[in-house]
A protein has these predicted regions:
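Receiver (REC) domain switch/output surface
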Residues: 112-124
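Short amphipathic alpha-helix used as the core "switch/output" element in two-component signaling
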Residues: 42, 64-76, 93
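Helix N-cap/capping motif at the beta->alpha junctions
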Residues: 33-42, 63
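Receiver (REC) domain active-site loop signature in two-component systems and cognate sites
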Residues: 58
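Two-component/phosphorelay signaling modules centered on CheY-like receiver
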Residues: 14-32
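Active-site T/S-Asp motif of two-component receiver
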Residues: 54-55, 66
């Protein structure tokens, strides 16, 4: 596990941000929060994050648009999208924009979130080694 990885949690629901912040910080990650896509993009442009965990359905710039903009900027940031409104269309868009993983909320098992984060960071490290 990359215990020093910087992770940005993006969700307009503050309770979800707090839950994920606590969960990830407890595993040794450096965690920041953003409560909108615009705020997240500002933070990403200011300092690099190894991983972004973002809700899809947010007002303004949603998670998929944010993901598209991150990829457009050629950033190798791992992006995991999450949603409480799962649909085939959103899953296809997430894959198209190269999301590392697609999680549905509410989370039945917080360990599944941690596993997705660890997989995403391991894949990123493997790609960097090529």
């Amino acid at each position: 596990m990359d215990a020093k990885a910087r992770i940005l949690v993006v969700d307009d629901e503050k309770g979800m941000c707090e839950f994920l912040h606590y969960l990830l910080e407890g595993e040794g990650y450096e965690v920041e929060e953003a409560h909108s896509g615009a705020e997240a993009l500002d933070k990403i442009h200011q300092a690099p994050f190894q991983l972004v965990l973002a809700d899809i359905k947010m007002p303004g710039i949603d998670g998929l648009e944010m993901l598209r903009r991150i990829r457009e900027a050629n950033q190798d940031t791992v992006v995991i999208v999450m949603t409480g409104y799962s649909s085939l269309e959103t899953a296809i868009k997430a894959i198209k924009y190269d999301a590392s993983d697609y999680l549905t909320k509410p989370f039945d098992d917080p360990d599944a979130v941690l596993a997705a984060v660890e997989r995403g960071l391991a894949d990123r490290q493997e790609e960097a080694g090529r």
